[in-house]
UniProtKB/Swiss-Prot annotation:
Belongs to the CISD protein family. CISD2 subfamily. Its cofactor is [2Fe-2S] cluster. The chain crosses the membrane at residues 38-60. GO terms for biological process: autophagy of mitochondrion; regulation of autophagy. Regulator of autophagy that contributes to antagonize becn1-mediated cellular autophagy at the endoplasmic reticulum. Participates in the interaction of bcl2 with becn1 and is required for bcl2-mediated depression of endoplasmic reticulum Ca(2+) stores during autophagy. InterPro entries: CISD1/2 (IPR045131), FeS-contain_CDGSH-typ (IPR018967), FeS-contain_mitoNEET_N (IPR019610), MitoNEET_CISD (IPR042216). Residues 1-37 are lumenal. This is CDGSH iron-sulfur domain-containing protein 2B. Binds 1 [2Fe-2S] cluster. GO terms for cellular component: endoplasmic reticulum membrane; mitochondrial outer membrane. It is a single-pass membrane protein. It is found in: Endoplasmic reticulum membrane; Mitochondrion outer membrane. The gene is cisd2b.
Length: 135
């Protein structure tokens, strides 16, 4: 079924399309084409543009990977790592660390991704540590 459809397209529909194809013999002939002729040319021009792009794409410059940017721009820049500890009475577990670098795989819980981030960027961001307040 699929092969019959492809065969019909190649053997009958493609030659019929190419017979009606308004390809002028000279460059100046393109100026005399009607709107209907240009509409008939669009599929071929689209395919040629796609093939041209796919041909030159390997030679185009690759996008440079954007360097990780700083998160902490001005808070406690004199400290090697900014970590805040907060005591909370109603906390169910003893310690909870929350990520502030937005790189954690277990976000919002900190997985120490800030260490690699700090090494790469020179930043000093650290986790937010919530401790259970002992009365």
């Amino acid at each position: 079924m699929v092969l019959e459809t492809i065969s019909k397209i190649i053997k009958t529909q493609l030659p019929a399309y190419l017979k009606k194809f308004p390809l002028p013999e000279t460059i100046g002939g393109f100026a005399r084409l009607t709107v209907l002729d240009w509409l008939r040319l669009l599929p071929l021009l689209g395919i040629l543009a796609l093939l041209g792009y796919l041909t030159i794409r390997p030679f185009l410059p690759k996008k440079k990977k954007q360097k990780d940017s700083l998160i902490n721009l001005k808070i406690q820049k004199e400290n090697p790592k900014v970590v805040n500890e907060i005591d909370i009475e109603d906390l169910k577990s003893t310690n909870v660390c929350y990520c502030r670098c937005w790189r954690s795989k277990t976000f919002p819980v900190c997985d120490k991704s800030h260490i690699k981030h700090n090494e790469l960027t020179g930043d000093n961001v650290g986790p937010l540590i919530l401790k259970k307040k002992i009365l």
